[in-house]
């Protein structure tokens, strides 16, 4: 189920289970994971897309292997805050992942995270080619970290375990 808020997402999350962060792209999908205490987001991997069936299978496998119970997915709003065509593509993919794996997903504004990830890798001294290999998983970690920070600031805790938003 698509969650409407961070609070709803955490109501579906059993304490101690991880959150998978996804930066969805047309060619690549960046992945990040929360730590079990929901303090930090850790870049995980970059998955190169193949086809819908394999993409969904790969993400379902990561959810199982990493004990992730819910998903935060970047929502690529336009700079004016409105949803564009890519938002609809992301939402459709999220619905398919929900159907395949049964997880709850929260779509979080990802504006500027790709630029932030690129800047961070540049400042770390990585060459452009090296940076492009990891930008997506860093973007996924940035989106997930924003959600973790908001949850902590608002005192939101994992209380669920039914994997379904309220």
UniProtKB/Swiss-Prot annotation:
Keyword Cytoplasm listed: yes
EC number: 3.1.-.-
Subcellular location: Cytoplasm
Transmembrane segment boundaries: none
Gene3D superfamilies referenced in this protein's UniProt entry, alphabetically: YqgF/RNase H-like domain
SUPFAM superfamilies in the record: Ribonuclease H-like
One of the GO biological process terms: rRNA 5'-end processing
Cystine crosslinks: none
Molecular function in Gene Ontology: nuclease activity
Keywords, alphabetical: Cytoplasm, Hydrolase, Nuclease, Ribosome biogenesis
One GO cellular component, as annotated: cytosol
InterPro entries (UniProt xref): RNaseH-like_sf (IPR012337), YqgF (IPR005227), YqgF/RNaseH-like_dom (IPR006641), YqgF/RNaseH-like_dom_sf (IPR037027)
Protein's job: Could be a nuclease involved in processing of the 5'-end of pre-16S rRNA.
Entry similarity comment: Belongs to the YqgF nuclease family.
Record protein name field: Putative pre-16S rRNA nuclease
Annotated source species: Anaplasma phagocytophilum (strain HZ)
